């Protein structure tokens, strides 16, 4: 068999899109060597020749990314090449349904808020309240649909909390606690470290503190002979409080401790571990197994897990954005005397401080029984799925702590205009009641006094 050593890789080893032209002088190498086909110097020389050719080719490539193709529209080019770039504003989205395009626009942006923490008693809304306007455009004519010809009774706007860059939602926050919480989902119990000794929790109820010479399942009262805190919670009933001949108490229990009812009972289950009913109990000292507590002998090899090696509970998840997270549509008049379909979200609060955005999503939950050509067309509730017809993001607003909060924003003309039309928007007073209205020093009191 004749074998040829190539000074450059064959043509079929590289895709055509990434392989330079073979007619390029920088890529072509000299003629094949005439020595032994598997000679080590020739192999090393061919590799060096190939690397040098590719280094020259890569150095000739431009460093910057090529511009987007010219045949793409400008909007598609930006969306396909600018997604996830830092500092880019998230763009609104809208879809066309039945020849109509729905568009959302935040006319009044949120600016700042005071964090409300994890209690619901002292909750401060975002100021100024976000006001979103809905516009519906006919695709055929390009004109906006008259508000009086739109049935808005089933229009709903949902809001959720997003990060300042608009890349991820931050609707949930973990409520951290200093003391661990007991949960049925945690298979082990968590105890406090006392006297510098390592605290352990047993996966199998009744397992001894030290490895016994024989399998034992007895336990004494929690405060006898234990080098660490036992399971927290209510007192446990000692099932094997009276020792059997030839057995050792795993917790150093008192052998004279009488059984609670005069006879031996099956071991009690722990509040933190529930074994599967398909397991069986091993017999020890030729005793019959207890059918009420079965498990296999292989389970005896399960050791105790130190708390430092487990994931302690970090608290429960709760919503970061609280309040009225949805709003119905209203036909309102703005300060310029123009009628439109508006969504006002005046009851939104954030638990934690930081920079955030609000994302608004518009959904029509109604199913019209007739074409929406007049305001009297009846609608029924959609019991299936409803698509998000439009969505948009607000500008970045800041949530302050209680000490750093500069105060609520002055009421805007738009808020005052909507308040006169029956929308429940908190309006700041003009301070006509005098300085005594506020604190003891004559200054304005807390923000609650201004509403």
Swiss-Prot record:
Residues 92-428 form the Velvet domain. It is found in: Nucleus; Cytoplasm. One of its GO terms (biological process) is sporulation resulting in formation of a cellular spore. PANTHER family: SPORE DEVELOPMENT REGULATOR VOSA, VELVET COMPLEX SUBUNIT B. Belongs to the velvet family. VelB subfamily. Component of the heterotrimeric velvet complex composed of LAE1, VEL1 and VEL2; VEL1 acting as a bridging protein between LAE1 and VEL2. Forms a heterodimeric complex with VOS1; the formation of the VEL2-VOS1 complex is light-dependent. This is Velvet complex subunit 2. It comes from Botryotinia fuckeliana (strain B05.10) (Noble rot fungus).
